[in-house]
Regions:
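Flexible loop/turn segments at secondary-structure boundaries
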Residues: 45, 52, 96, 141-145, ...
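Walker B catalytic acidic pair
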Residues: 137-139
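Extended, charged coiled-coil "arm/hinge" scaffolds of SMC/Rad50-like chromosome-maintenance ATPases
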Residues: 1-94, 125-131, 219
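Conserved ABC ATPase signature
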Residues: 87-115
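Conserved catalytic network of the ASCE P-loop NTPase/AAA+ motor domain
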Residues: 102, 125-128, 173-179
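Metal-dependent nuclease catalytic cores in nucleic-acid-processing enzymes
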Residues: 113-124
């Protein structure tokens, strides 16, 4: 009797269930279409990311190719690693980037190339959300230790002039070839003769903080 009771109860539960509804083919096709669109959008996003990354690397490379102070890394390819957010150099004919590029001077040049390339890329794609200017604080840091009346060697002077020339040529490229605008604000320890005597026409000295004159006027903190 127990077994019969269990069977009867199970049968009654089956009868109480909702009847199986036929498949709504129209709705099914609609959902399948939405799924396909989402999958295609994902592919499009990945393609856009790939294209934008290549464009960024090309802009960085254009600036890097103008340098003459990295002879050991001539013909290397610049590659922005978006997973680690760093710029790397890939030797010609190789697949993997260098782990280290040596001196502070080399990293300073890579720093300049990245940010100039980034702004160039954003100008190329017509973005409007990032202002077209850079603030650069003392690119001469690798060559000056901070002592007063300090002089640097000829090799370091050549490298620093190379960095200034890169900034100057970038402004010319954006304003002349791209027909756009850009501005660089630079606070620098090196003397102004670097640009006044080397035809860096896009440089303009706003003020000099020498002989006791500072960014904050002395009469403010002497009161």
């Amino acid at each position: 009797f127990i077994i019969i009771g269990e069977i009867k109860n199970a049968y009654e539960q089956i009868l109480k269930r909702d009847k199986i509804k036929p498949i709504d083919t129209v709705r099914l096709n609609q959902l399948n279409g939405e799924k396909s669109n989402l999958e295609n959008n994902l592919k499009d996003i990945e393609q856009v990311k790939f294209t934008m990354k290549n464009s960024l690397n090309q802009c960085i490379q254009r600036n890097y190719n103008q340098l003459s102070s990295l002879p050991a890394y001539k013909n290397y390819q610049t590659q922005f690693n978006d997973s680690e957010m760093i710029l790397q150099l890939v030797p010609e004919g190789q697949l993997f980037p260098l782990e280290n590029v040596g001196s502070k001077s080399n990293y300073m040049f890579m720093h300049l190339c990245f940010y100039l390339g980034l702004h160039e890329h954003m100008i190329n794609v017509g973005q409007i959300h990032v202002p077209q200017f850079l603030f650069i604080d003392q690119p001469s840091i690798p060559y000056y230790t901070g002592t007063s009346n300090e002089k640097i060697g000829n090799d370091d002077k050549t490298k620093l002039l190379d960095a200034f020339s890169l900034l100057n040529s970038f402004i010319s490229y954006i304003t002349t070839e791209k027909k756009d605008s850009f501005q660089i604000f630079m606070v620098e320890h090196a003397p102004k003769e670097y640009w006044t005597e080397n035809n860096l026409t896009n440089f303009y000295t706003v003020d000099e903080f020498i002989n006791g004159k500072g960014l904050i006027p002395s009469d403010i903190y002497n009161e």
